[in-house]
Amino acid sequence: WEDSEYDLTGMANHILIDPSNYAYIVTRKVSEAGNISILQYILENNIAKNQGRDLMIYPCRWCTGAGASDKNRMVAYVNEKEKVRIDIPVMLGRVMTQPDVQQMAYLTAYAGQIGQVKIMYYETIRYKDGI
């Protein structure tokens, strides 16, 4: 949020953590006298909630060991269309077939499209290793 110069549209609204830490914050109570989990406490008491935005925390198996020195990673990012995009993958398809007399064969060309996540503004995503 600081890197986006405190613009509310740059405040992270999604957090991904490894499943073991997620299970811990879901099952562990805030205190012995508490009646809510750590996850519920975080979701109800955070800066995003105070500013009228909803924070979502999800488990992600790819966060396990993804950090430096095989430590677990946390990813905080803004999940909005203007900030994060992905190209829609297109199935592999046959685009052209032609006979080849010398090889006594048909040569067929195939084409497809794969996509990757595109971060449009790097101020809206952060990684934290070793959680």
Q: Which stretches of residues belong to each language-model region?
A:
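Extended, solvent-exposed, turn-rich assembly/linker loops in the middle of proteins
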Residues: 1-36
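Sequence/fold signature of self-assembling virion shell proteins
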Residues: 24-131
